[in-house]
């Protein structure tokens, strides 16, 4: 899903670092997976991969399954991790993360 954007080895390392429930940190994950240093275009491409229902927003249910977009065998985020992730990215308070909010979150 992220071919041409992210390296498989980086994805594997990023997932390994947050295997245990409660250890997910979006900033650390973005850095490990190599997203932080990507172009605005690649960051947008990643958004559209994560936006599974193609609504133009990443909603809470999509955030919960965020890690599984990178690898089908990955765990779901805990409710606390999901809510913290949403709160960090949802700057306009509409309950979802739009593409511009996503870009700002990745670069934060």
Swiss-Prot record:
Binding site for Ca(2+) 1: 51, 53, 55, 57, 59, 62
Name this polypeptide is given: Parvalbumin beta 2
Role this protein plays: In muscle, parvalbumin is thought to be involved in relaxation after contraction. It binds two calcium ions.
Modified residues (N-acetylalanine): 1
Gene Ontology CC: one annotated term: cytoplasm
Species the sequence originates in: Merluccius paradoxus (Deep-water Cape hake)
Keyword set, alphabetical order: Acetylation, Allergen, Calcium, Metal-binding, Muscle protein, Repeat
PROSITE patterns according to UniProt: EF_HAND_1 (PS00018), EF_HAND_2 (PS50222)
Domain (EF-hand): residue spans on this chain: 38-73, 77-108
Domain of life from the UniProt record: Eukaryota
Similarity field: Belongs to the parvalbumin family.
Pfam families referenced in this protein's UniProt entry, alphabetically: EF-hand_7
Annotated Ca(2+) 2 binding sites: 90, 92, 94, 96, 101
Misc note: Is regarded as an important allergen.
């Amino acid at each position: 899903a992220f071919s041409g954007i992210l390296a498989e080895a980086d994805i594997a390392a990023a997932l390994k670092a947050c295997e245990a429930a409660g250890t997910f940190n979006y900033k650390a994950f973005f850095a490990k997976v190599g997203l932080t240093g990507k172009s605005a275009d690649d960051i947008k491409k990643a958004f559209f991969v994560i936006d599974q229902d193609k609504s133009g927003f990443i909603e809470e249910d999509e955030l919960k399954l965020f890690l599984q977009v990178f690898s089908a065998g990955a765990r779901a985020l805990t409710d606390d991790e999901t809510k913290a992730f949403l709160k960090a990215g949802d700057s306009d308070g509409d309950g979802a993360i739009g593409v511009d909010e996503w870009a700002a979150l990745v670069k934060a």
